[in-house]
Design a protein with these regions (language model features):
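Short helix-capping/linker segments at secondary-structure and domain boundaries
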Residues: 2, 24-26, 158-166
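GST-like domain detector, emphasizing the conserved glutathione-binding G-site
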Residues: 1-139, 143
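GST superfamily/GST-like fold recognition
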Residues: 141-165
């Protein structure tokens, strides 16, 4: 069985978990402490970061983008797309994942001014996504895709941020 290594509430792991769940791939998850990473984890993770996915063949994969692409290649894709559409989907997914850490930084802001500046930058990213969505619920219209899965961690945290300022 596939094994996913994580720490609690990691947006990069949430993206991988979303892909696993959407594809109905059974997996187990093992949580580690971010501030006290075990040596076995440091031995298998080239960058010492999560997520790490260990395949059925004991191959260790790292970096969420690479893991999600592996899952799409290994298991039935959520959808069949042209090479051009696949590149567009990746680009929109990268737009999401590059904002994971800035969003976490926004949530950890120490003062109101820093929070508001960081929030304004995040809002720009969401406005671009909303423009792409148009009147549809999902990036591809009426069904969830890999792009939507990439945006899930941001949307989850946006809800948390909104709840804290309202």
């Amino acid at each position: 069985m596939i094994k996913l290594i994580s720490f609690k509430n990691c947006p990069f792991v949430q993206r991988v978990m979303g892909a696993l769940v959407m594809k109905n791939v059974p997996f187990e998850i093992e949580y580690i402490e971010l501030n006290n990473k075990p040596q076995w984890f440091l031995d298998i993770s080239p960058n010492g970061q999560v997520p790490v996915l260990i395949t059925e063949n004991d191959t260790v994969l790292f970096e969420s983008d690479a893991i999600v692409e592996y899952l799409d290649d290994k298991y039935t894709p959520i959808e069949e797309v042209s090479p051009e559409q696949k590149a567009l989907d990746r680009a929109w997914s990268y737009q999401a994942s590059k904002h994971y850490m800035p969003q976490c930084g926004t949530m950890a802001s120490k003062d109101k001014e820093t929070f508001e500046t960081r929030l304004a930058n995040l809002q720009k990213a969401f406005l671009k996504a909303e423009k792409k969505l148009g009147d549809t619920e999902f990036f591809k219209g009426d069904y969830i895709s890999n792009v939507d899965i990439a945006w899930l961690p941001l949307l989850h945290r946006a809800f948390v941020i909104k709840a804290s300022i309202c």
